[in-house]
Each structure stands twice: as C-alpha cells, then as structure tokens.
C-alpha cells in the first residue's frame, strides 16, 4: 500500500544519515545533527583526537553527546502508523522507482562532491577517496541549479502566457475578420442583386419602347400598303379611262374637246394620295431611341472601365528609361513627360535606343500581376469638350418641341404636307482624308522589342498600343482597327493583366472601355510611348 506524502516526509526526518535506517536511540552532537548512538561510536577522527560530524565536518566531543527522547518517541509513533497502514515495523517507505542509488554500495546518494563533481552516498563520503574533499548535501548543491531552472521556467511561463494571449487575440482577430468577410459577402450579393434588378428593369423598359416602335411601324406598314394599293387601283382606273379616250377616232375625240380642255381640272394630280412610309414623328422617336442606346453603351463602358480599374488592378507609378529614348524626343527631369522636337538631337546612338522611331520605353517592367497606369495627352484642341457641347445643344433642341408619347397610335403621328414626301432620301457624302502624319501611341511592349530602323510596332513585333491622331483613334493591330469611343480621351488608362494575357485601354476620365488586346505574354513587359506630334506632350500618371 502506498505511503502518503506527509508520512514519507516524517520518515526522512527520523532517518539516520549514517545507517540510513530509523534513528535508534537518537543522540545529538555539538553541531546539532542527530544520529543513532551506535553510529556515533563508529565515527573516527580525521585529524587530531576529536571526531568530526559526517555532515558538516565540525569536530565534536563524545562526552557532549546527548539523547533526543522526542525523536525516539516520534520514531515509535511513525512505526505505529505504518503498522496501521499495513507495513511491518521498521520498514521504510519505498522510494520512487527512479530514485538513484550508489552503484557501489546500493545506498541513497545524499552528498555531492564539489571537487569531483559526483554524487556520493554516506559510505562513499567517508571513504578514503572522498574524505578530504568538500562534500555538501545534494539539496544544497542543487539549489543554484534549481533556482536557475525555476527562473528559466518562470520566463518560459511568461512566454507561454504571452503566446496564449497572442493566440487568443489572433483567434479573435481572425474571427472578426471572417465575420467581416461574411458581412462583405452578403453586401456584395445584395448589391449585385439590386444592380441586376435595376439593369433588368431598365432592359425591360427599353425593350417595351422598342416593341412599341415595332408595333407602330408594323401598323403603319399595313396602313401604308393598304392605302397605297387603293390609290393605285383608283389611279389605274383613271389611266385606263384616259387611255380609252386616247384611242377614240378623231371625230369622236373632237366632240369631247370641251371636256378635254378642262382635263387637268377633272383629273387633278392632287386628288391622288402621296404619303410617307414613316411619319416624321416616328422617325424622331426612333432617333431618340438610338440616342438612348448610345447613352446605354457609354454608361456600360464607363461602368466596366471603373470596375476594371478599381477592383482588380493595382495603380503603379512608372517612369521612362532615358537610355531607350529616341533622339527625336525630349524627356522631362522627372522622366515622366516627353515632347517631340522634330530634329534628331542625340550625339551618340546607344544599343538600347530607338533611332528612326520616336519611341521610348518605361524603366520598370512587369512579369506578373495586374497593374494600371495612365498616359495624358496634352495638345490644344484635343479634348471632348466641343463634342459634349454639340450633344448638349442637340438635346436641348429636341426637348423644345412637345412630342407624342410612345402610347400614341400610328395615325396620331401622321403629319401634313410640310413633312417629307415619299421617296425622299438623305444624301451622305464621305470624304476621304489624307493620312495624317501627326499622331502618338501609348501601350506596352516587350523589353526585347526591336529599336533600330523603321518598325511597324504591331503585336507581332511585341507592341500592344493605341494610336491617337487628329483624324481618329486606332488599335495597332494588323491591319489597324479604327475605334469609335464616345469621347476622345485626354487621359488613357492602361490596365495590364500579365497572367490573363490582356492589355485594356480605357478613357481614364469617363471610365469608358476603349479596346482590349488578348494574347499570351512570355517576356518582361514595359510601358511604351511613341510621339510624332509637334506641340504635343505625353505625360505618365501618376
């Protein structure tokens, strides 16, 4: 049966350090240590005539040995308790199984030799080998190490508490972040659902207007066809009647001379209907509907361009590489602006420099990610203000007249003789303009793009760019594709998706989507500018 910890502690207090058994007839010596009386008689003097205490090495006189009756009584009580616990009297409490014993004497190791750094039992301590050495109790020798361990243990416990605190805070932060993400997910779903509903409603509204126009034109077509057939039949009868009169003999014809003299009065041309296939008001409503479609196209392009820039791309600040700049170009001190000089100004030609083409590359390249920057074109007259003014004036003129609604019937929209007559068509003249040499290009290029000689600067050459000129805007494809944005961009946004293989151009001010190149990139890409336009500047933003 296991012995309780308090009992084991009492047993250690009444154990003789020499015989390692219960104190039998316990006595105390001058230094205060207690041993069995029989054990003290075995203590031999180390030097001189006086024996010394085995524990503290202090000499004592045998005549000063005194019995300790209280300890003797305590030993008896302990033995009685052990009997009550099922142990034989005199049997010591078992030591833990991992308690180390002296390999030589199979005794407990109570001492530590500071000279040899070894654990000693009582017999080893009294041996000739260790008697001259300084030996202290194991507990005393272990005290500094124990303190060191406890200090380090306290440090580790503090670290553990800190880590637990950090972990708890981190878990709370992660939970808060996950909660926020969930809220954002719900917000995104709700916003897009609302947006879908709004667009669906607007779509249905436009489709309803379109259906109304289709119905009006279909009804008008049937009415126009029916009335036209009726008038043709009536006119055919008149023609047949006149043809019959024209075939009459001269005598009979002369008898009708009085009637024929007023032929124009009897058969006036104005009596016959000449109508328009599409009434003026229907044409006007159809034109208004086309304007709405243009507004829809512009709004959707602006929406797409803004989402593309704000949600997916990282805005970067780029500068130009002066060593790649053509001698026809002049760079600003911050390497963000170029102007066209018209004269080659470079004294020496560098290997990485454009010679014939007035181009320049960016100093920063990209091999991954989604990045965005802007290029601003500064030149007098290059703006969309005039076009906006014209559109506003046309809109004001259209709003001045009161017009029928979409719910009116076809016949309500018919007009009088002031409307255009049937068969009248508007003539459109197309003028072929000579190719304008003044232009600029903005986009991206491979860092290995050719720079010597006359270059086409197309995608197959490693350049993906827009060309802007007074005559229009083109995508530098093969062949060139002319583009028709709603507004001429003063600032062009360039969005590069390297992994996605796209270069997208937008109007940075109106957010209108202009054009997208699609390919697979395998080399480092850099910004690309090309300018052959006097009194114009290209500036990198931001």
Swiss-Prot record:
Statement: the UniProt record of this protein carries the keyword Coiled coil: yes
PROSITE patterns listed in its UniProt record: B302_SPRY, ZF_BBOX, ZF_RING_2
Compartments, as annotated in UniProt: Cytoplasm; Nucleus
One Gene Ontology cellular component: nucleus
GO biological process: host-mediated suppression of symbiont invasion; innate immune response; positive regulation of non-canonical NF-kappaB signal transduction; proteasome-mediated ubiquitin-dependent protein catabolic process; protein K11-linked ubiquitination; suppression of viral release by host
Membership in a protein family: Belongs to the TRIM/RBCC family.
PTM info: Autoubiquitinates upon viral infection. In turn, autoubiquitinated TRIM26 recruits NEMO and bridges TBK1-NEMO interaction.
Subunit structure, interactors included: Interacts with TBK1; this interaction bridges together TBK1 and NEMO in order to activate TBK1. Interacts with INCA1.
Main location: cytoplasm
Annotated protein name in UniProt: Tripartite motif-containing protein 26
Gene that produces this protein: Trim26
Keywords: Coiled coil, Cytoplasm, Immunity, Innate immunity, Metal-binding, Nucleus, Transferase, Ubl conjugation, Zinc, Zinc-finger
SUPFAM superfamilies listed in its UniProt record: B-box zinc-binding domain (SSF57845), Concanavalin A-like lectins/glucanases (SSF49899), RING/U-box (SSF57850)
Entry annotated with the keyword Zinc: yes
Renumbered residue ranges of the record's region Disordered: 379-440
Zinc finger (RING-type): 16-57
Domain B30.2/SPRY: 298-542
Pfam family, one: PRY
Organism lineage: Eukaryota, Metazoa, Chordata, Craniata, Vertebrata
Segments forming a coiled coil: 197-243, 411-440
Residues the record lists as binding Zn(2+): 102, 105, 124, 130
GO terms of molecular function: ubiquitin protein ligase activity; zinc ion binding
């Amino acid at each position: 049966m296991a012995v309780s910890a308090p009992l084991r502690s009492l047993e250690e207090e009444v154990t003789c350090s020499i015989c390692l058994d219960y104190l039998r007839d316990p006595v105390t010596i001058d230094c205060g240590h207690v041993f069995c009386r029989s054990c003290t008689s075995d203590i031999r003097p180390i030097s001189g005539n006086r024996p010394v205490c085995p524990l503290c090495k202090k000499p004592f006189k045998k005549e000063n040995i005194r019995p300790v009756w209280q300890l003797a009584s305590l030993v008896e009580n302990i033995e009685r308790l052990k009997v009550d616990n099922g142990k034989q009297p005199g049997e010591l409490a078992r030591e833990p199984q991992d308690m180390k014993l002296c390999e030589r004497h199979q005794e407990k190791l109570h001492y530590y030799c500071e000279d040899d750094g070894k654990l000693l039992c009582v017999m080893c301590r009294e041996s000739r080998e260790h008697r001259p050495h300084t030996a202290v109790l194991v507990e005393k020798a272990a005290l500094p190490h124990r303190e060191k361990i406890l200090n380090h243990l306290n440090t580790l416990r503090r670290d553990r508490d800190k880590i637990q605190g950090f972990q708890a805070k981190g878990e709370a932060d992660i939970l808060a972040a996950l909660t926020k993400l969930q809220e954002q997910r719900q917000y995104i779903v709700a916003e897009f659902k609302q947006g879908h509903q709004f667009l669906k409603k607007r779509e249905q509204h436009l489709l309803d207007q379109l259906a109304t126009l289709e119905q009006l034109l279909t009804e008008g077509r049937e009415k126009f066809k029916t009335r036209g057939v009726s008038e043709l039949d009536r006119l055919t009868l008149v023609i047949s009647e006149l043809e019959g009169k024209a075939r009459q003999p001269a005598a009979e014809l002369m008898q009708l001379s009085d009637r024929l003299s007023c032929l124009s009065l009897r058969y006036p041309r104005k009596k016959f209907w000449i109508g328009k296939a599409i009434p003026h008001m229907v044409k006007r409503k159809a034109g208004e509907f086309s304007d709405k479609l243009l507004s829809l196209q512009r709004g959707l392009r602006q929406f797409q361009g803004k989402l593309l820039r704000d949600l997916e791309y990282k805005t970067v600040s780029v500068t130009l590489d002066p060593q790649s700049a053509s001698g026809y170009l002049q760079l600003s001190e911050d390497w963000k602006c170029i102007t066209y000089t018209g004269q080659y100004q470079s004294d020496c030609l560098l290997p990485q420099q454009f010679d014939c083409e007035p181009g320049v590359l960016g100093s920063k390249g990209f091999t991954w990610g989604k990045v965005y920057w802007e290029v601003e074109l500064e030149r007098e007259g290059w703006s969309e203000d005039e076009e906006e003014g014209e559109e506003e004036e046309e809109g004001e003129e259209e709003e001045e007249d009161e017009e029928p609604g979409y719910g009116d019937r076809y016949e309500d929209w018919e007009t009088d003789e002031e409307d255009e007559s049937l068969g009248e068509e508007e003539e459109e003249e197309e003028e072929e303009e000579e190719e304008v040499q003044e232009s600029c290009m903005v986009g991206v290029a491979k860092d290995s793009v050719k720079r010597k000689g006359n270059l086409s600067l197309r995608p197959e050459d490693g350049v993906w760019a827009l060309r802007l000129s007074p005559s229009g805007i083109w995508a530098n494809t093969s062949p060139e594709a002319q583009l028709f944005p709603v507004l001429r961009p003063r600032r062009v946004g360039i969005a590069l998706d390297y992994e996605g293989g796209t270069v997208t151009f937008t109007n940075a001010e109106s957010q209108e989507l202009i054009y997208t190149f699609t390919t697979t990139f395998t080399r480092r890409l850099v910004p690309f500018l090309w300018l052959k336009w006097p009194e114009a500047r290209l500036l990198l933003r931001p």
